[in-house]
Amino acid sequence: MAKVYIITGPYGSGKTEFCIQLAKKIAGESSKKTVIADLDTVNLSFRSREKVEELMPLGIEVIGGHLDNNTAQDVPAVSFAFLSAMNQDKNLIIDLAGGRIGTNLLSHCYDYLKDAEYEFLCVLNSFRPDTQNAEKMVDFVRVISGAAKIKVTGLVSNGHMIHHTEKKHVTLCRKEVIKASEILQTKHYMTLIKKEFYEDLKNEINFSENVLIFDKLEMRKDYQ
């Protein structure tokens, strides 16, 4: 049976960035094949299926829309081929569209998920309008859980301002995510942090959660 990681979050949270970094980490640590199911048919600016050529040599398969596995496909079409991966011994990462649209889609997959070993993770960035503080984060997570018909099992802290990110963005967001996790009684699953910041912060912060350290952003070329 697959280990399933379902990733949601508001637009601009860095949800897809997290999916790719998580896939690279898992693929490097596990003997099982890792699959990313790119179900983001809404955000056309940055999608995990645009990284197919880079991820394949790492043993990471990307499942996109049903017409093709290419970046030219901008129609709102979803492949449900990823469901078969749940019956195989693979690591499956599901990259949902941001907000309620993605989680509404997930609700149709409930029968497949209920018996699976899964984590339903919400990526949060306190430097986005919908999730500026713990209270707004809590409201967002509750709406998402209701739409998906399954409970969010963990929160991911991803404080960033893309290429203008500083250490303070990481620490400030992390504090709000911790508060939100306490209110929701949900675990603070992970903090996503660039290597250069982690080296400075590891002596200042006692990271009780998992820490996903990355070297570079996997942004679209026209964003760099």
What would you call each of these model-derived segments?
Residues 65-70, 90-105:
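Switch II (G3) loop of P-loop NTPases
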Residues 15:
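Conserved lysine of the Walker
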Residues 25-74:
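N-terminal phosphate/diphosphate-binding loop that engages ATP/GTP or pyrophosphate donors
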Residues 100-206, 221:
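Conserved catalytic-core segment of NTP-binding enzymes
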Residues 11:
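The conserved Walker
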Residues 4:
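Walker A (P-loop) ATP-phosphate-binding motif of ABC ATPase nucleotide-binding domains
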Residues 7:
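Hydrophobic anchor at the beta1->P-loop junction of P-loop NTPases
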Residues 18, 22:
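Hydrophobic positions on the alpha1 helix immediately C-terminal to the Walker A/P-loop
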